[in-house]
């Protein structure tokens, strides 16, 4: 078996900790000792070896103990894992199932394991060449098998596709193991004292890495379905309190949401938290500060805030601050005034970061900004269907930023920079300001340039809005952006909540927004 599978086997079998899984139907937590989880993984391995030993296994479903076990089960069988999301609310079941199996086939996955209603939907599709197995059956066969040696990939991880077509990153067992070890080393994970709590989806690199890092450390982990969080976000705080969690992770919008509506919080104890990772999307310094201050009466330590940087191409984490420092905000001064950017820490062990100042650089008066390039032991072997990358080469991320005294600062995406009248404007700065307008949905704002083909380059802001007075809201948005960003939007487009297209991980699909606006014109 791979070193990744071997190390996880030793850690899970020797662990005295538990995997606690929330049953959404009953709202009860089910306890599964890590050695038991590994026993289920061995059963999944046996099932896979009895079914033609696939090179890759697709997983779809809620984050049950069986699904978590199936990840290690696939690795014991020498197979790669690809995890795809279930249907979103309002989706057509047949179309979702057909699209899911088509995606699996497109990346070479011909064995899929699922359970419950997901399984029934997938089996309703007549797709030749795909074996669809019952995950519950596979995990409870009590069939162990000799692990298989394999030099193939461990994970076929989809990239977000927020600024273009999604691709599939090929992650080797060594890359995954290096990233998990680097993350645990940076935050100092200790199985004897730490408890993790997560609602992040396992098909997303941050959610998968959080679960696997706990398994690697043998630390207790409380795992809830993402749908349970989205149905009632403030339950997250109750889970943290009930579990005595010391570690959690979420994208920026979750912290903003809790901080904004903190008056709804009562009777929780967050005093044990020492690591609250913030990643997956741009960090709002003001929103994160508001969260920390609002949670302080409940025992939260602001030093636990860890805004971080990562991407699927590097397995997950690239830079993470040391716990205890808290949010560091770097002020950048340009022609429109001062802007705050979160400092995202230094590279985890095994990774390197540099800034390439070429044609994509967006200079300003106080910092030299260039494209962020990375390399290291956590890097992907390449994109599926493309040439492999040289492990010694620097990988251009497409993100713009700079290196400050406290570590990496990310300013935005290179292809998203808006150039108007000789100025380079980062959309996230405009979006954070626009989201302060009453009625504008936080995390549902997109700032775009009108493009080179326009006779008059300008700034367009599209936002999901709910309120009685669009005219006043539009005027306030224009005034705020003009005052704080030094640019007057040429147009503001309000759409109904939920209208802006998103990726499966919840990121706004900027190119799709641009296309829809162009079609409307």
Swiss-Prot record:
Pfam families: AMP-binding (PF00501). The keyword Zinc-finger does not apply. The keyword Transferase does not apply. It catalyses: a long-chain fatty acid + holo-[ACP] + ATP = a long-chain fatty acyl-[ACP] + AMP + diphosphate; a medium-chain fatty acid + holo-[ACP] + ATP = a medium-chain fatty acyl-[ACP] + AMP + diphosphate. Activates lipidic moieties required for mycobactin biosynthesis. Converts medium- to long-chain aliphatic fatty acids into acyl adenylate, which is further transferred on to the phosphopantetheine arm of the carrier protein MbtL. Belongs to the ATP-dependent AMP-binding enzyme family. This is Medium/long-chain-fatty-acid--[acyl-carrier-protein] ligase MbtM. It comes from Mycobacterium tuberculosis (strain CDC 1551 / Oshkosh).
